[in-house]
Design a protein with these regions (language model features):
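Bulky hydrophobic segments
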Residues: 1-134
Length: 134
């Protein structure tokens, strides 16, 4: 149960991204439409997902030189985005997979990872060892 309390936001965001990615219709906001809006939305979703994963791992004393941080904070969101694009293409009509969406996902994840790598050590204090979920 402690795992869900510590990493709950990462889990909730992962499920929210999946849900938004597979629902049949996505609400449109005509006043906010512009040419690359879809790509910007993908970038932001995965930027937030990767940033939150990095934050929760860092709070549990995972350093950015740690393999687990790279795996879950960077690789997981990128692979997750690719898997969702494949699922959209093959199992959730009328949704379609788009590799340029996946590139936007990956760029958002990479941007968040490197921003977190530079900002978290300066502004966020890891939890005490006794509270760690490691």
């Amino acid at each position: 149960m402690r795992f869900f309390r510590v990493y709950g936001m990462s889990i909730v965001l992962s499920l929210a991204v999946l849900y938004v990615s597979i629902i049949r219709t996505v609400p449109e906001f005509p006043d906010l439409q512009f040419r690359w809006m879809d790509k910007v939305a993908h970038f932001i979703m995965y930027f937030v997902l990767s940033g939150v994963v990095c934050f929760e791992l860092y709070r549990q004393r995972y350093d950015f030189s740690d393999r687990q941080m790279r795996l879950w904070g960077l690789i997981y969101p990128i692979v997750y985005g690719g898997v969702i694009e494949l699922l959209q293409e093959n199992f959730f009509p009328p949704r379609t997979g788009d590799w340029s969406d996946w590139v936007a996902d990956a760029l958002g994840s990479v941007a968040a990872y490197f921003l977190a790598k530079n900002l978290l050590p300066k502004y966020v204090k890891p939890e005490d060892q006794g509270l760690s979920c490691r």
